[in-house]
Amino acid sequence: WCLLRATAGFFERYGVYRDVDGVAGRQGRVWLRDGDWIVRELLADLGSHLPVWRANASEELVRRKEGMIGPLMDALRDDAKNETSLETWAAWTLGRIQPHNARLHAMFGSVVRDAKSLNLRLQSLRILAWCARHPRGLPLPDTVRAALTDTEPRIRREALLAIREAGHNSWHADVLNLLARETDRMVFYTAWGALRETAPAEARKAMLDDQRAGVRRGALLSLLEEDALAPEALRLLAKDTEHSTAWLSTPSDPPHGLYGR
């Protein structure tokens, strides 16, 4: 009996058919498509423990396009009920509906800056990066630049990943400023990786003469990753006044590694 009820509920839930007024055996049946209660069920499915329910609900909401923007924004505003999975899937579904929507773009930018939820801030940065790569998407907003100075290391790292994935080569000054002051190793690692992806080798070689030790070390690591420095250049860098840069430039077997001692 439980199995029969669950099966009937599944078909009713996903719009196969429903008896009019719930009367079994009735000839007239109503197909359920974009009714309000179905939207609520789809939103609930975004927070389901079953990945297939989340994926199917997201695809259906994206298919319905701009009509779902309001309900999804309401779902994100409902802080009391939001779990991480629902928050993540609702945000990404909203971002995928219209990558070129300036209103949504501004909303995600404000979330990066102001939201209480760390997860929602991180997801918003990822969505903005995805939109920047989309053929019809919008470029990264200045909110991403501000995120590079955030007190939370995970936000700084995600902002760097957004710059890297979007392929922005006009943000070098911001990345270099971060390299100059960054103390978190994971963020520093991400920063020189972003530098490597967005700046050509010759430009990074010029950064080896930068007055800021963190910039020199970041540029050096990115060039070592590509084996792009001649032995004589490494010998000069081995005399650097900053210990980590000098140590990284000294030949060793096995190699020193990607960051330093």
Question: Model segments located where?
Answer:
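Beta-propeller domains with acidic blade repeats across secreted/periplasmic ectodomains
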Residues: 1-33, 37-40
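Amphipathic alpha-helical scaffolding segments comprising HEAT/armadillo-like alpha-solenoid repeats
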Residues: 35-44, 65-78, 99-113, 134-149, ...
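Alpha-helix N-cap/helix-start positions at coil->helix boundaries
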Residues: 51-52, 81-85, 117-119, 153-154, ...
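Structural signature of alpha-helical solenoid repeat scaffolds
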Residues: 62, 92-95, 129, 164, ...
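Alpha-solenoid helical repeat scaffolds
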Residues: 41, 56, 71, 86-89, ...
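C-terminal substrate/ligand-recognition segments
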Residues: 4-5, 35, 46-66, 85-88, ...
